[in-house]
């Protein structure tokens, strides 16, 4: 959520930022007008309260002098009723303001490139060379089906489209990757591991920015008004909702594995085969709470932590700086890590690493105290996939496939696979 004071003081700048994003559907002038009404009423309330105090002081004085206080008491009663009515008006205005503010996206950082689609993202760096084959490589879903380790038909029968049943070595590979990623981020990168709930309440979804705008993309449990987590970012960030963190605790670094659930509304026809776009998938997520002055340095570190997974697995990738049109609702700045997928003949997103600045913190009211003598401020929040597990499985099946249909297991995870070096058909 944007600070209303920031909008009021820099209205033209905020309008220009929204224009950079190509965003519409909300009225910045309206929210500024509502804020003006709110502040005017609050001034009236303050004046009435001061008058109320002055009048209340007259009562004991008049009583002491033996004079009638009924007129003064009636005036106090009238002032009290007027204040109560104005308080109701302020609450109504604030609710209208919040309704608008919750739908306004974050302001892009000045270094975010201008653009409309992912074609306008800017490549920052690459690692490794695209995998070359002496044969025509198969897409990962064919590799998995031929090996008997991915069963899309059974998953479709059990549930529906965009679900996968992992069998045998695929299930072991998925589990191995989750453990490998968690161990790397805790043991080498200093994150604390969490295992959060896989369902969250509405306040949590609002806090991280999924609601109200993206409710159609969420899986809801209507009996409780709970939501299946679209990402571990939601429960982990909301641990500190409405809390004040002591400054000496920052930065706080968490890593969490969760299954993720997304309806993928609006993605019909995109990546309909394989593991790339599923309704349910596993992900290891990195989340940071940091001081504002440190947030961009911490974003670089977080991105480095995520890409280390791919380096150890030996998977070629690139990092791109995301343009305004592809930035997403909550981020001020974002990197995507894209892994090379031979069957696509292109790089495919496997991680997004974002700095939200104080956007989520304002929505979730997450503050910190810089030191014992300072006023509280909003923290900056960051997160990134470290990594999307299903897409990592897909990348391994594609990049390490052999001409005989087998798949070489990356050396870094063989200890998690009971020493198996290769996946072969049974």
From Swiss-Prot:
A GO biological-process term: seryl-tRNA aminoacylation
Main location (coarse class): cytoplasm
Pathway: Aminoacyl-tRNA biosynthesis; selenocysteinyl-tRNA(Sec) biosynthesis; L-seryl-tRNA(Sec) from L-serine and tRNA(Sec): step 1/1
Cysteine pairs bridged by disulfides in the record: none
Top-level EC class as recorded in UniProt: ligase
Residues annotated as binding ATP: 262-264, 349-352
SUPFAM superfamilies reported for this sequence: Class II aaRS and biotin synthetases, tRNA-binding arm
One Gene Ontology term of the molecular function aspect: ATP binding
Keyword line: Aminoacyl-tRNA synthetase, ATP-binding, Cytoplasm, Ligase, Nucleotide-binding, Protein biosynthesis
Keyword Transcription: no
UniProt EC number: 6.1.1.11
Subcellular location, record wording: Cytoplasm
Family in the record: Belongs to the class-II aminoacyl-tRNA synthetase family. Type-1 seryl-tRNA synthetase subfamily.
Protein name in UniProt: Serine--tRNA ligase
Species per Swiss-Prot/TrEMBL record: Alkaliphilus metalliredigens (strain QYMF)
């Amino acid at each position: 959520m944007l600070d209303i004071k920031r909008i009021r003081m820099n209205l033209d700048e905020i309008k220009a930022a929204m224009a950079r994003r190509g965003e519409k559907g909300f009225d910045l002038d309206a929210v500024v007008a509502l804020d003006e009404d709110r502040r005017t009423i609050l001034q009236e309330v303050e004046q009435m309260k001061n008058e109320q105090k002055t009048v209340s002081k007259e009562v004991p004085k008049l009583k002491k002098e033996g004079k009638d206080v009924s007129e003064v008491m009636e005036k106090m009663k009238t002032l009290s009723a007027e204040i109560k009515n104005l308080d109701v008006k302020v609450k109504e205005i604030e609710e209208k303001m919040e309704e608008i503010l919750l739908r306004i996206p974050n302001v892009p950082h000045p270094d975010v490139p201008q653009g409309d689609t992912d074609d306008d993202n800017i490549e920052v760096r690459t690692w490794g060379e695209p995998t070359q084959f002496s044969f025509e490589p198969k897409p990962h879903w064919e590799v998995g089906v031929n090996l008997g380790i991915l069963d899309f038909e059974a998953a479709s029968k059990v549930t529906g489209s965009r679900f996968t049943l992992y069998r045998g070595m695929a299930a072991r590979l998925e589990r191995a990757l989750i453990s490998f990623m968690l161990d790397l981020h805790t043991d080498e990168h200093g994150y604390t591991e969490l295992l959060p709930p896989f369902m969250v309440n509405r306040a949590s979804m609002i806090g991280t920015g999924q609601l109200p705008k993206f409710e159609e993309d969420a899986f809801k449990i209507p009996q409780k008004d709970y939501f299946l987590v679209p990402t571990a970012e939601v429960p982990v960030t909301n641990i500190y909702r409405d809390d004040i963190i002591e400054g000496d605790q920052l930065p706080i670094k968490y890593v969490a594995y969760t299954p993720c659930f997304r309806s993928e509304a609006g993605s019909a026809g995109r990546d309909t085969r394989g593991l790339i776009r599923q309704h349910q998938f596993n992900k290891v997520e990195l989340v940071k709470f940091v001081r504002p002055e440190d947030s961009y340095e911490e974003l670089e570190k977080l991105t480095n932590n995520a890409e280390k997974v791919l380096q150890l697995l030996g998977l070629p990738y690139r990092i791109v700086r995301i343009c305004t049109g592809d930035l997403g609702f909550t981020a001020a700045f974002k990197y995507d890590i894209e892994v090379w997928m031979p069957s696509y003949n292109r790089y495919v997103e496997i991680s997004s690493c974002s700095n939200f600045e104080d956007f989520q913190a304002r929505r979730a009211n997450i503050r910190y105290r810089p030191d014992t003598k300072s006023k509280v401020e909003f923290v900056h929040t960051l997160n990134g996939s470290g990594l999307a597990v299903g897409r990592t499985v897909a990348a391994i099946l594609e990049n390490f496939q052999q001409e005989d249909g087998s798949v070489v297991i990356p050396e870094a995870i063989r200890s998690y696979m009971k020493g198996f070096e290769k996946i072969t058909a049974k």
